Amino acid sequence: MPKEHKKRGRRDEQKKRKRDADDDATAKRHKKDDVDAQFQPLDAAHQLHHGGVGEDGELTRPGEVQFYGMLDEDEQEFFKNVDDQLDRNEFASPDERAQWLKNVFKEAEGKELKIANSQSCSRVLERLILLSTPGQLKNIFEKFNGHFLNLVQHRFASHCCEALFLQAAPVVTQELANPERLQTPPSSNPDHIFVSMENLFLFTLAELQEHLGFLMTDRFASHVLRVLLVVLSGSPLERQSKSVLQSKRKEKVDVTGAEKGREWLAEKRAVPQSFLEALEKVINNCVSGMEPHYLRSLATHPLGNPTLQLLLKLELSHFGKSRAKDEKSLIHRLLPDDPIAEGTDSAAFINGLVYDPIGSRLLETIIENAPGKLFKAIYGEFFKERMGSLSRNEIAGYVAGKILERLGKDDLEEAMRQIVDQIPSLVERNRTAIIKTLIERCVARGVDTASIKAQLETAYGGSNGFEVIRILKLSEEDGKPGGEHKQQSPEKLHGSLLAQTMMSVEGPLGNLVFDSLANLSPELSVQLARDPPASRTLQAALTSPNASVIFRRKMIQQFYGKVGELALDPSASRVIDAIWNGTAGLAFIRERIAEELAENEGSLRESYVGRAVWRNWRMDLYKRKRNDWVKQSRYTAGNDGFQSFPESDGDASNSQTRAGKHMTAIELARQKHAAAKAAAQGKKDMKKEKTERHGTGSNSSAVGTKGRVVAQ
């Protein structure tokens, strides 16, 4: 296994600063004893890589990493001050910051490589890249040109390369959409040659091309290579799995002012045809020189596996699933047998991945992206009769989840029958992710969930029937006031997600959770609100379209007298925010909550989360102009008059449409009673008016006169 990826920068005070040359040497080592013991074929795989074998048959690795020198003390102090100024963000205007940034880059002129390799200053360069203009990004590209092979393998410089590729990606799309951007701008340097961002990326790829096989399993370069592949493909950068693009331990580097205009991260980008051609060439070169045996060894390599996943996904999504028939394709090299049957190399490969902590992730990618014909063959041969046993396993359960996402209705019903029998065992082992996926797919395919409901009701049953606190794993220590919010266990998070998924299903399955929540004591309800995972379940319950008015009324009333206290808690404050939407059709409850918030104004204003609740509930308007607050809150609820209990003063049907999908029997009875009472009152008023209009005796003239006056 590779060494632990420590956080970098001056914040890691426990480590002494080392020379960059030592870091470079460390970056090239992979705990050779551990890795080679498990993945012996890798060196041979690298030797077989195109361009990776010399004439004498020895492995051609990248040369010695170049040492670019170190910043002197004054330079380090300067960039430390730059980092502090970025944190303070005390610029009067964006123009002032742009001018300051220009001066910083002027000071850094000629020192870019030293900064990128510096333990204390590389983070500063990474933050500066996030604020850079396209011209400044191109300048950094040009300074790094010819040195990328060294930089991507460096512990600190590799982060700068990642940031540079990500920030430069939209510039390629902008230049493609607006060719006038490619016109050579006036330059003070007559020898300056204008280069498009497209060509800068292609130059970088050409520099790395010869050593791609080695970089795929390099501790730091593998992450940069994946980012570069995603940029070339035009795929959304934020939708990629974090484990595929970067290490889980990677420090999140950000800077104020870089948040705006980053919507492109979640969007598919238009890229030039040269990028797609380069991507196809990379995929071909990465596998063309490797025998299938050596290529498969990457599937269980901790660094090679994510790169292999990405290459496989990009191949099938960008070049058509018909590519699987091409003998030179990556998917065909991994699974060459047709048909795939027991006893073949492909079968041995698949069976070896199912229970492997690393290899199973590649199998998930194959299942998710394989052509329909190939998926059906794999499912029928290896998994159709094993869904129950797969779901019980901690690792294979995730493979089973991916399989469920691709099954049709008939196959899903058969798989459900196998998994439902295992639900008691799954609940006992806290492996609820597969149950959540099964419910979601049953809803999507229109499969009846009655058997799932029965098993869950039994598995989480107690003295009072189904107990939601068992599914949420709530202990006596959780949610206590003044307690610290510790990192939550995966079991609690998965339990909360399962409860939320159940509530998204209309009918008996969702009602299990709703009824259990409504029957909790006020103390337990407050405890749930304070517990982070359980709090999200409460939020979902209060805002669910399947939650009835009666449930929301009962649930919210559990918090009476505790609203001010809960609004100060980081988790419970979000429940108070959710009550705003949860009181649609419940005017008196919304105003009751607002009154409690107003009573605790002082403490709320002194707390960060309290101020957020105060703002979300528009309490400033409530304090100044309460009538306006009432009108606006009624308008946002979509009902001119909120539904009160037990009678309705407004449009009950509209309230019910927004608050819940269906009215219960008692709600229908109340609506009918209110309508009958209103009709009776109307008849009574009409009779009285008729009597007054046709008055008798000495009062007839007076009554008639009064009627005429009113009519006027």
From Swiss-Prot:
Q: Locate the region Disordered.
A: 1-40, 640-712
Q: Which first-to-last residue range defines the signal peptide?
A: none
Where does the UniProt annotation locate this protein?
Nucleus, Nucleolus
Question: Residue spans with biased composition (Basic and acidic residues)?
Answer: 10-35, 682-695
Q: Which domain of life is it from?
A: Eukaryota
The Polar residues compositionally biased stretches are 640-658
Q: Which organism is it from?
A: Leptosphaeria maculans (strain JN3 / isolate v23.1.3 / race Av1-4-5-6-7-8) (Blackleg fungus)
Instruction: Give the coiled coil ranges.
Output: none
Major site of localization recorded for this protein:
nucleus
Question: By its UniProt entry, which InterPro entries does this protein fall under?
Answer: ARM-like, ARM-type_fold, NOP9, Pumilio_RNA-bd_rpt
Hey, which family's this protein in?
Belongs to the NOP9 family.
User: Where do the Pumilio repeats start and stop?
Assistant: 107-142, 143-178, 207-246, 345-380, 381-421, 519-557, 558-595
- What are the alphabetically sorted keywords of the record? Nucleus, Repeat, Ribosome biogenesis, rRNA processing
Q: Name one GO cellular component term.
A: nucleolus
A GO biological-process term: ribosomal small subunit export from nucleus
Keyword check for Nucleus, yes or no: yes
Under which name does UniProt file this protein? Nucleolar protein 9
